[in-house]
Amino acid sequence: AESWFGGIAGREGDRETAADIEPLLKRTDLVADMSFYFLYEATDLLLREQNCKLENDGVLLNMLPGFYSQQSHLQRFTKLFEDQPINKEKLILTLPQSTVLSANKATLEVISRYIKNGINLLLDGWDYRSFPVDKVRELGIKAVRPDPSLYLSADFAGVLSSLPDLGITVYAAGTETSDAFRWLAACKVSHIAGPICGHEMTEDDIIRELLLKDRENA
């Protein structure tokens, strides 16, 4: 979200964008610190929603490439949750399926530690043919975002429909076609990881949308 970035010195009213920090994202030595920065800002957003007594299923963070090859920063995470008491289940971190399939023993241990400590990981780009449902459950994953190339498949429809009963939440990406949305709804998919129209939203946009929703339900 644009409002998650800071101001720019000497340019009053301007805010940093993803393009401004792109060079930093390419520095692998900053992956851990940048990831924690995004996590902190997402936690702050959830706390703001909580203080406004607004309901939201959570905030999904697309984690930086290489995040899971870093040493676990669970101690920092735990301290963060102590400072800002929120439900950890509402912070959802993406875990690319390709990362798991190519992970060495050390990386798998880091992933396992996050899951065991209540960090909610979403298996991104999930393909049931190369990563069966049983393997998802064995890993302890409770959320998946399917590979869009599998949409409209009759075989995959049966697999998706069975996941809610197994305690696994399925997320759409928010940029699907109307046909894909109808198919996903028929497969019992009711969560979208992003705005339905696919545009960027600031923190204030999210709060405003939740306030309007709360007013409609009053």
Where are these predicted regions, by residue range?
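Distinct, well-ordered alpha-helical segments
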Residues: 50, 69-82, 102-110, 130-143
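Alpha-helical scaffolding segments of alpha/beta enzyme cores, especially the outer helices
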Residues: 44, 75-79, 106-116, 134, ...
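Metal-dependent enolase-superfamily TIM-barrel catalytic cores that perform enediolate-based chemistry
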Residues: 38-40, 92, 111-117
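Bacterial c-di-GMP phosphodiesterase EAL domain
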Residues: 1-85
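Short acidic capping loops at alpha-helix termini that bridge into adjacent secondary structure
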Residues: 87-91
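EAL-family c-di-GMP phosphodiesterase catalytic domain
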Residues: 6-14, 65-67, 94-102, 119-218
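A broad detector of the eukaryotic-type serine/threonine protein kinase catalytic domain
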Residues: 23-31, 115, 164, 168
